[in-house]
Design a protein with these regions (language model features):
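N-terminal binding-site loop/beta-alpha segment at the start of enzyme catalytic domains
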Residues: 1-74, 151, 305
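Short amphipathic alpha-helices and their capping/turn segments at secondary-structure boundaries
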Residues: 36-48, 111-118, 193-196
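Short, well-ordered amphipathic alpha-helical segments that serve as non-catalytic structural scaffolds
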Residues: 12, 103-116
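Alpha-helical membrane-targeting segments
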Residues: 60-98
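Active-site mouth loops of central-metabolism enzymes
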Residues: 1-7, 94-109
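Non-cysteine beta-strand/loop elements that form the S-adenosyl-L-methionine
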Residues: 51-55, 77-87, 200-207
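Conserved functional loop/turn residues at catalytic and ligand-binding sites
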Residues: 20, 120, 154
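Beta/alpha (TIM)-barrel catalytic core signal, keyed to glycine-rich beta->alpha loops juxtaposed to Asp/Glu
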Residues: 8-15, 28-32, 113, 125, ...
């Protein structure tokens, strides 16, 4: 969100809420360690109307002196968690990486208690292990803590937010940690197999949009051919972004799709994409073309082009 003040951050959250967004994703490290506190202030304004995801696994960066909130606070989502509240949400841009946690029960308990305090709530809706890998899940007491925290009403559910390959390894060996799985997915990725986990996807656009747009602009013949097949001008950045976002929604129709924005107009536009059924057919066709004509190896090149 650039160099935003606390007031500006709260204002963009209020704008997102006005558009129907009522689930917010955050982490202790976001906003140089201040994002949970700001989100907590916002949540307190709307008691019983907002749900929250936060995480344990990457500590906040340690900075001396006063630090203004210079990043987004939470990622907008365009689907809601079944059984919680229907809605869309906003999400925080990351601060600098402050290292990785030990993924022990004692450390996790301290992190959870801090998050509950910062968020000014007695219960966190979704609590994720942040960037955890299979090798990190060595402490059986950590799983017990998460299960006991659900039973105690401190969290509603839990899971892992990590890379897709790490999620797949955990699902194969330690599925008990994965009631919820959060990972990146865009039209450049293969379809996700059916899983028992509730899925949260992110990065449908960002560098994936920039890379694909650049490739299409450099290959005018393909851009023209695909535009005709899709029925939309793919040289238009708004059209391309809308179809990429819609395809990501269609890939995870019962889950959550996260996106970040510092612009209330962009948030409004993304909400409109979620509600526009006429985009479904062209979005599916775009995804089919990418999967048929861009190999997995080349998809990495498309991302790199961004």
């Amino acid at each position: 969100m650039g160099s935003m003040t606390r007031a500006e951050s709260l204002a963009i959250l209020e704008a997102a809420f006005d558009f129907g967004i009522c689930h917010f994703d955050v982490a202790p490290m976001y906003g140089y360690g201040q994002a949970e506190g700001v989100l907590g202030e916002f949540v307190a304004r709307h008691p019983g109307r907002i749900t929250v995801t936060t995480k344990y696994g990457i500590p906040p960066a340690k900075r001396d002196g006063a630090i203004s909130i210079a990043r987004a606070i939470a990622r907008p989502v365009v689907r809601a968690i079944p059984g919680l509240k229907r809605g869309l949400t906003s999400v925080a841009s990351r601060a600098t990486n402050a290292g990785k946690a030990a993924f022990t029960a004692s450390e996790a308990r301290e992190s959870l208690d801090r998050s509950l305090s910062e968020l000014k709530t007695g219960c966190i809706d979704v609590w994720l292990l942040h960037d955890a890998t299979l090798a990190d899940l060595h402490d059986e007491a950590l799983l017990r803590l998460m299960e006991e925290s659900v039973a105690a009403g401190k969290i509603r559910t839990f899971g892992v937010g990590s890379g897709r390959s790490a999620i797949e390894e955990i699902a194969a060996v330690r599925p008990q940690f994965l009631p919820v799985a959060q990972f990146a997915w865009s039209v450049l990725d293969t379809a996700v197999p059916v899983t028992n986990s509730f899925r949260i996807h992110h990065r449908a656009l960002t560098e994936n949009f920039r890379g694909l747009r650049r490739q299409l602009l450099e290959d005018r013949a393909r851009c023209s051919r695909w535009s005709g097949l899709v029925g939309s001008d793919l040289s238009d950045p708004r059209s391309l972004a809308a179809l990429m976002l819609k395809a990501a929604l269609l890939e995870n129709p019962t889950g959550i799709l996260l996106f970040s924005s510092k612009s209330s107009q962009h948030i409004r536009d993304n909400v409109a994409v979620a509600d526009d059924a006429t985009l479904e057919a062209p979005a599916r066709r775009l995804y089919e073309l990418l999967q048929a004509e861009v190999s997995p190896a080349n998809s990495h090149q498309v991302r790199a082009a961004g």
